[in-house]
Every structure is written in C-alpha cells, then in structure tokens.
Amino acid sequence: MTQQPEILHYAVSVVGKDRSGIVAGISEVLFRLGCNLADSSCTMLAGEFAMILIVSHPRPFSKSRLFDELKPVCDSLGMSLALRTLQADEISRQETDGEICIISVYGADKPGIVYRVTSELARRGINITDLNTKLIGTPEEPVYVMMLEVALPEGETPEGIEKILANLKQELNVEIGVRVVTPVAF
C-alpha cells in the first residue's frame, strides 16, 4: 500500500492600495500553478485592499516557487506579499461545541469599543471567528459599527452573552445585539 503524499498548504497575504484586478491577478497565478483556493478573506479598509488566502497544492511544491510566481504580479499591482507554510494541524477545521452567534455593536464613535467588548468575550473564553468594524454616519455625527461572529464555548448561551454585554451597553452608551446563526446543511 503506497502512502499518499501530504498536501501542502500555504497562507498567502497580499496588502496594498485598492484597485481593480487584484483578486483576478493573484487567482490567475494560483490557477496556472494548479493550486486550490481553500479559504479566503478579502476586504478594503480606508482605500487599502487586503486578502488572506489558504491555498493548497496536491504535489510537492516549494514556498519559494509560489513566492517567485506571485511576486511579479504583486509588484505590478503595487501590493506587498507574505507567505507562510502551514502544518497539517493548522489547517484542520475547528469544530465548535457551542453555538455560533453574531454580535452587533453600534453607537457614537469613541475609543475603546473594540477593546472593551472583545476583552469581555475573551475573559469568558469566547472565540471571535470574524470581526468587522466601520465608521458610518456623518463627520458631525459619526456612528461606529462592529460586527462579530463568535463561537460560544460549551456552557455559554446567547442569552448569557446578552446579559454580560448589557453592562457594557450602558457603560459605552451603545446598542448591542446577539443573534444565533442557524447552520445550513448542504
């Protein structure tokens, strides 16, 4: 019985001034190389575009080759590039015992909103799986919006999280909502 070679995975990070064609340029290189795009997250923040990709290749494939192929495209797009080899235990999907919830926070912009909310969640062992913030409203009346996707540990409930965040809601003078994400089976 022959052993299958281990599939190599890399984390690819690309950051730079936003412009059209970034995703197409990077994904074209990955396609030409025969890489599979497993997970990705792309966003624009204050005119800067950032993408993080988890890519795999079924055959032995060096990190330096991947870098050498991506670097000219990144240079032509004015993007910085970083690569990291991932070990097998780093790419396994983490199953959560508890529920997945979305927490929304919004109110007048002020320092400390992210810190206060996330430190309270961390203190209770709640893992943040996604976090986005945005300043909306007008220059005269800015409104800060934060959306978090969290995985509740065993024993925590959405109602319990609402209770703990109720104190912060008053202290920070913000609105905080918690809702459960219902998984969909495919």
Regions picked out by a protein language model, each given a short descriptive name:
Residues 1-186:
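A conserved regulatory-domain signal marking ACT and ACT-like small-molecule sensing domains
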